[in-house]
Structure formats: C-alpha cells, structure tokens
C-alpha cells in the first residue's frame, strides 16, 4: 500500500467530511427519533418522569456515547483496519491466524449485525412517519396507525426497489441532507436546552450512576435497554471505515456527537417543561414549534431513508465479505455503479425487504419495535470486543493490558446485553431467531468446506503429466477443446484434487492442447488482482494461482484472457493460430471450463453428523448462485461434472451370484 494512499486514508477533507455524514452516521444519527420516547414510555409516560430521571437518562446517554462509541470504536477500533477496510469480518481477517476458534465470534457478530439490519429500516422509517401525528393538518389521517404502516411500506418498497440501479447519483445528496439534519438536531436542541440550563448537569456521570439505583427509575437496570438505542449505530460506524477513511471520521465525529447530545438535551428540557401536561407525543417532534413540524417530519423521513440505505449497503458488503471468507453461501452479485464498493445482491435485498416489511406489519408501531430493537447488536459489540483484544495483542500491546482494557468494554456491553435480554419476550425473539438461522447457515457452510478438505485426496500433477502429454497427442480421441480449464479451490504447488485427474483421464479422456488449473485465492486486501503461474516445465499444463481481493468479482474468463496474452507474449505458451475465424490474426483457441461438483455418496468414512452437514449444504446450494454465475461463466462454454465426494469409497457391497445348477448337482 503506497504512503500516498495511506496518507489520503488518514487525511480529512471538506468533501470527505460531508460524505462521511451521509454514509457513516445514518443509524446513530437517527437514534434521537425514538430513544427519548422509549425512555418516557417505559417509565410510564410523561406524568411519571422526574427531574432526577431525566438528568440521569441524558447522563447515561452521554457517557454511553463517550465510552462505547468514542473510546472503543472511534479511538480504538478504527485503528484496526484491514488495508483500510473496517467491520467485524475485516477485523477477523486480521486475527484469524491467532486462533481457530475466533471464527465463532466472527460468525456470531456477523449474523447478529445482519439480523439487526432487518429491524433498523423498519424502526427508523416508522418513527419518522409517526411524526406526522404531531402535524395538526395531518394528525387526523395519521392517528390511524394503518395509514402510518401503509406509508412506511410504500417508502420501503421504493427504497429496496431502487437498489438494483445503485445509489451513485442520489448518494451525492446524502451528505448535504445529513449535514442539514445534524445542524437541525444541534440548533433545536440548543434552543430548547437554553430554557432549562440545569439539563447541562447531565454531563456529570454521578447522575447516570445514581439513576441506576434510584427508586425514581421504575425499570432499574433494565433502563439500559432503552439507553442502548442511542449507540446502536456504533458498529456501523466501524463497518463503513473503508468508504470514507479514518481521517474523515475523526474530523466529523465530534460535530456529530455534539449535535446528537444537544438533541437529547433539548428533548429532555422539553420533557421537564411539559411533564405535567399529559401530552402523548414523541418528544423529538413535540419539542419543535407546530409550524415547523411538517418540515422536520420530511427531513426526518429523508434521514431515516439515508440511514436505511447505509444499512442495506452495509448488509451487501457484509454478506459479500462472508462469501469470500467461505463462511456463507455464494449469491449472485452485481455492480450497478462504477465503484466496485457499490454492489447489489438480489437475494439479500429482497430477503431484507421481506423481513423488514413483516416486521412493520407484525409490530405495527415504533414503540413495539423499539421494545425488540438493540438486543442483537449488543451481541455484535461483544464479539467485536473479543476480536479487538486479540488485535491489540497482535499489535504488541501486553496481553494483560489488552485483556483488561477489553474486559472493561465487555463488562459494559454485557450489562447492556442483560438489560436488553428482557426484550426477548417483547419481540426480541424475532431478531434472535433470524440471527440463529444465519449462524446455522454459516456453520453448515463452513463445516461442509472443512469436511471436503478432510476427505478429498490430492495427487501430484508431475506424476501424471506424461500421461497428459500422451493424451494430448493421441489422435484416436477427438479434440475436446483447445484449452480445458479446471476451476478448483484446492491446489498447492503441483497437488490437485484426484477428482480432476479422474475427469481428464478416466471419466472420458479429454484431449486438449493446453490444460489449465485455476485456483482463486481471496486475499485480505480488498482490491487485489494478481496471479502466479507454474507450467511444471511444460507448454501444455498451466497452474494458475489467481489472487483476488475480498471485494473483487471473481469473473475468471476476464482475468484468464489477460493471463493468456501475457504467457504468449513472453513465449511461455505457444500461440494457437486459428485457420477458421472471423477475427483476423486470432492467436488464441477456444476454451471450455470444467467445474467438479462433489456430492455425498454412500460413504462409511462419513459420520452421521458429517453426512447431515453435507446433505444440508447441498440443499442450501439449490438457492445459491451457481458456479457458472459466480465465476462469470454464463457466456462461456462450461460443464459441471458431478463426482462422489469420496472417489475411493465406491464400496463393494456383499452380494453373491446365483449359479445355475449342473445336472450332477440336481441329482
């Protein structure tokens, strides 16, 4: 990585500042929409709150944002970039060689973050639309919650429907809109706070600690379940590191944090002034003059859409990284924009839409959604903390110091987890069940890969290259193709799967001029595209190690075209002059790609559990992207050959021949 690129990553610019507002802070920036309302509702309404309760609540929010978001994520986690990419899978990539078991927190964290993504668009958009109840001209329409639901579903349908076209153009508006949003949060919060300056006492952590044991807090420690809503976007902040750079996050976070805290203080000041009024409105909207509320609702809806968009895009990135790490099924990926980082996964998009829509229909109100929201993300944060401890040790921090530091954050997050656990019975089970389903798929997929690696046998190409040469020159067999390309995910030096040689020599001898063996290796760097070639001292066997970054499309034919030209230009591969062609001067023959697909056969070596894993993985494959699509072979000549997982395990079953009796035997 060049120093110039590294400097740009750590540099803050005015444009980067604006872009960061639109990409990084959507989730945490829309938390003021519902956090204070959740606190008031769980306390029993405005009439049940006191000054001590409000001061303590705001103090808890301020110190949660400081300890968890600022110190853990902004100051520590952002240092853990994998070639300028952030997020739990990038963090796992940095430390996975330190211990095999670290894949467990990576899977749990990724699954819970993905499941949380199904709830965030639902709660943010619903909260924004419910703000129309505070607009006198529209309150009569939106007092009917069905109209809120229908409007929310319409917005979500349009949002998810537009994903296939990318967000290149409209994405440029995200930053300016969020700049206005945060400015409004800060200004309105400041104006309201000036009416009750005593709210500034909330900066003192004493009020936060006192509230946890105060009898004025009706929910005790479980109030932290609502407090945690203020920092749910911290994990997304880390995940979006690669999109905007560390320097721009460092520059923009102080502004964002101040605006958010001012908003909470302003809402708290309004609550103190109206706690005896009996008003049943969201403090966020009620704290703004009636004449401005409709504009605030429009702005809040735009902010909610931007937050949802950032989360949807983040889900695509998360899934694509899991695929590259071979812990998630392969789904079709398209790139609607010019930027490789802007991707679209149809299956994930419409699955998210279905789950999000069902969430809106099931919970109906944002209050009910808030009761279920946040449980999954506490698990994600705990898993990130575990991985961060290993990262700090890897970077030279003394193990004891790293363990103590991360234990401090783990303690805080575990308390939040316990406080949020009560949400399980109030709808939190929805995201937990979804997360468990995702974990199940990840475990099956990863375990299946491990089982195949355990049982598949490898053979040396050097031991068979003489046979391959004889086959190439054996005119008794028709030419199968000029170039035959075998795609394999297991190749080490001259060792390849036995099933590949079985396909070439045994199944039906495949005569070709050149035999290619291509292994795609996913690198820790996001945008790598390099290769190594070993021809084993021949001009008819080419072993290619293709190194692609975890965010690069694995369109093998495009890369192979360049590799062929390089080899011919360097004289290592003979030119394949074509007598019949519509392309004058064509020097490359035709290609056929062969993919070997292992299937579970009757195999005594496989345990019952291993057989279950392999059969389940085979079932999952029915809804995943085919190897043809994944490797970009839709427009190439390609063949999928099915072979038993264990070629050596075609067992001789006990069976006896019934012989005809001779005359002597009959006598």
Curated annotation (Swiss-Prot):
It is found in: Cell membrane. Pfam families: K_trans, K_trans_C. The chain crosses the membrane at residues 16-36, 58-78, 101-121, 146-166, 167-187, 221-241, 253-273, 294-314, 343-363, 373-393, 399-419, 431-451. This is Probable potassium transport system protein Kup. The keyword Zinc-finger does not apply. Its main location: membrane. Keywords: Cell membrane, Ion transport, Membrane, Potassium, Potassium transport, Symport, Transmembrane, Transmembrane helix, Transport. HAMAP family: Kup. It is a multi-pass membrane protein. It catalyses: K(+)(in) + H(+)(in) = K(+)(out) + H(+)(out). It comes from the Bacteria. InterPro entries: K+_transporter, K_trans_C, K_trans_N, Kup. Transport of potassium into the cell. Likely operates as a K(+):H(+) symporter. GO terms for cellular component: plasma membrane. Coiled coil: none annotated. Belongs to the HAK/KUP transporter (TC 2.A.72) family. GO terms for molecular function: potassium ion transmembrane transporter activity; symporter activity.
């Amino acid at each position: 990585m060049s120093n110039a690129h590294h400097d740009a990553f750590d540099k803050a610019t005015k444009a980067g500042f604006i872009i960061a507002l639109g990409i990084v802070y959507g989730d945490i920036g829309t938390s003021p929409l519902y956090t204070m309302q959740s606190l008031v509702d769980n306390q029993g309404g405005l009439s049940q709150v006191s000054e001590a309760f409000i001061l303590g609540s705001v103090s808890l929010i301020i110190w949660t944002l400081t300890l968890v978001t600022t110190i853990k994520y902004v100051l520590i986690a952002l240092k853990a970039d994998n070639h300028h990419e952030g997020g739990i899978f990038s963090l796992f990539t940095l430390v996975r060689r330190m211990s095999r078991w670290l894949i467990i927190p990576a899977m749990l964290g990724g699954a819970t973050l993905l499941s949380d993504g199904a709830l965030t668009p639902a709660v943010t958009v619903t909260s924004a639309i419910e703000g129309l109840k505070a607009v006198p001209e529209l309150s009569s329409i939106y007092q009917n919650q069905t109209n809120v639901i229908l409007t929310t579903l319409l917005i979500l349908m349009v949002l998810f429907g537009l994903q296939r076209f990318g967000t290149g153009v409209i994405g440029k508006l995200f930053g300016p809109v969020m700049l206005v949003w945060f400015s409004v949060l800060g200004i309105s919060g400041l104006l309201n706070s000036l009416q009750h300056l005593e709210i500034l006492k909330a900066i003192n952590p004493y009020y936060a600690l006192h509230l946890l044991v105060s009898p004025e807090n009706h929910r005790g420690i479980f109030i932290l379940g609502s407090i945690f809503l203020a920092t749910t976007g911290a994990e997304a902040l880390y995940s979006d590191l690669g999109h905007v750079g560390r320097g721009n996050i460092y520059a923009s976070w102080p502004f964002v944090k101040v605006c958010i805290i001012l908003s909470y203080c302003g809402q708290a000041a309004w609550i103190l002034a109206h706690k005896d009024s009996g008003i049943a409105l969201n403090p966020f909207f009620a704290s703004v003059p009636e004449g401005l509320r409709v504009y605030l609702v429009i702005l809040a809806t735009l902010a909610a859409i931007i937050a949802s968009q950032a989360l949807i895009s983040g889900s695509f990135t998360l899934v694509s990284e899991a695929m590259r790490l071979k812990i998630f099924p392969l789904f079709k990926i398209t790139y609607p924009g010019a930027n490789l980082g802007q991707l679209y996964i149809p299956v994930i998009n419409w699955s998210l839409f279905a789950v999000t829509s069902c969430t809106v229909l099931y919970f109906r109100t944002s209050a009910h959604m808030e009761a279920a929201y946040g449980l999954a993300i506490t698990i994600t944060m705990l898993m990130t903390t575990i991985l961060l401890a290993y990262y700090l040790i890897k970077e030279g921090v003394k193990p004891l110091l790293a363990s103590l530091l991360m234990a401090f954050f783990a303690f805080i997050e575990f308390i939040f987890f316990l406080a949020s656990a009560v949400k399980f019975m109030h709808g939190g089970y929805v995201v937990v069940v979804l997360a468990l389903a995702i974990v199940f798929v990840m475990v099956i997929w990863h375990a299946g890969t491990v089982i195949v690696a355990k049982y598949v046998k490898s053979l040396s190409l050097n031991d068979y290259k003489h046979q391959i040469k004889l086959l190439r020159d054996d005119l008794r067999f028709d030419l199968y193709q000029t170039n035959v390309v075998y795609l394999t995910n297991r190749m080490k030096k001259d060792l390849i799967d036995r099933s590949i040689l079985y396909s070439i020599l045994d199944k039906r001898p495949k005569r070709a001029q050149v035999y290619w063996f291509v292994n795609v290796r996913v690198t820790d760097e996001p945008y790598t595209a390099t290769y190594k070639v070993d021809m084993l001292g021949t001009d008819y066997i080419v072993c290619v190690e293709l190194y692609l970054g975890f965010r690069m499309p694995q369109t093998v034919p495009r890369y192979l075209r360049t590799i062929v030209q390089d080899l011919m230009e360097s004289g290592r591969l003979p030119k394949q002059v074509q007598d019949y062609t519509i392309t004058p001067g064509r020097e490359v023959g035709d290609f056929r790609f062969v993919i070997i697909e292992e299937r579970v056969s009757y195999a005594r070596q496989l345990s019952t559990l291993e057989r279950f894993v392999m059969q389940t993985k085979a079932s999952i494959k029915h809804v995943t992207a085919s190897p043809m699509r994944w490797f970009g072979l839709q427009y190439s000549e390609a063949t999928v050959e099915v072979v038993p997982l264990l070629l050596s395990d075609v067992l001789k079953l006990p069976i006896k021949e019934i012989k005809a009796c001779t005359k002597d035997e009959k006598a």
